[in-house]
Amino acid sequence: MPLKIEALREICSLENIEVTTHAAKRLEQGGISVGDIISCVKTGKIIEQYPTDYPFPSCLILGMNVKNVPIHAVIGTNLETLWIVTAYFPNLSKWESDLKTRKENDS
């Protein structure tokens, strides 16, 4: 069953967010805060689904950070907790101008 942004928004709070080790490194490298991730979920749309991710299904969300800058966040969930898998500012060398569509040559 695909994840729904409305369900993610309902559980999106500091008490329900876990940050993976990989995500912690990426957030620090990119200057991204957990507040930016919350903003992304609250303002964003799911643009890719990863239903077979382990240990929980995940999805890629395109939303805005707290400074209203587009951001991508991969969020896994068991519908009780949100796990931040990674987050980054989308790069136009890998994404079309809509920031929702991967470029063909991206692997």
Q: Where in this protein do the model-derived segments appear?
A:
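Ribonuclease/tRNase effector modules and their secretory precursors
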Residues: 1-107
